[in-house]
Amino acid sequence: MFAARLLQARQLRGLSQRALGDRMGLGKEKGSSRINRYEHQVTAIGFDNLGLLAQLLDVPAAYLLADDAAMADAILALAHADDTQRDALASLIPALVEDPALLAKVVELLQLAQGRQAKGLRAQADGD
């Protein structure tokens, strides 16, 4: 998963392997080769380089290491939240995990809200 997330994050930033390697301080030639080996799972990454890559790509290191897409998405969402939102979510997540009925209700409310929002957007588009 690390290799795929590294590739995706690098491409989203519009960086070539060479440019990212150069920003890591590896030089253009060596850097390109090293990033290529990371992206093709030929070379494992050390913690120092992981932290530097995450910083250069503006993603949390945990995002690059997440076990699955849902976890990666949650990590990115938390990273983009402000302190108040992050604190609220940090207390909410364990409560939702511990109470499946509460989680089901919250999911239902979110789906309802998203449906209403989509309906409003369609009505707005039809009115234009």
Language model features: what each stretch is:
Residues A3-M24:
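Short basic helix-loop element that most often maps to the first helix and adjoining turn
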Residues L6, L20-G21, S32-Y38, L64:
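Conserved hydrophobic/aromatic packing and binding residues within compact polymer-binding modules
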Residues Q11, G25-L26, N36, H40-V42, ...:
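Residue-level detection of the helix-turn-helix DNA-binding "recognition helix"
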Residues S16, G27, G31-R34, G46, ...:
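Short coil turns linking two alpha-helices in DNA-binding domains
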Residues L20, N49-L57, L64-L65:
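Hydrophobic micro-packing sites on short alpha-helices
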Residues R23, D67, L109:
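Short acidic/histidine-centered micro-motifs embedded in hydrophobic/aromatic stretches
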Residues G31-R34, H40-Q55, M71-A72:
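Short, basic-rich loop-to-helix N-cap that marks the start of a DNA-contacting helix
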Residues A70-D128:
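Interfacial/linker helices and their anchor residues that mediate assembly or domain coupling
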